[in-house]
Amino acid sequence: DYISVKSPIVGIFYTAPAENADPYVSIGDTVKKGQTLCIVEAMKLMNEIASNEDGIISEICVTDGQVVEYGTELFRIRR
């Protein structure tokens, strides 16, 4: 059973809090509800995107630095 984490805003997807920092999550990581998965930058504001369920990251659907639209699937989480 999988759930999708979708972008709530239009912006630029980032996997880490800073350029040389480790990514928030990788495929296979266990995550908890409310845990930060990525950042979507919109109008110079960094918006943390959190998991809406406990589970395991099964897929990262976009690449670092990619522009995402509202509703773009960012992650798939296996429950």
Locations of regions flagged by a protein language model:
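Structured functional modules or segments
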Residues: 1-79
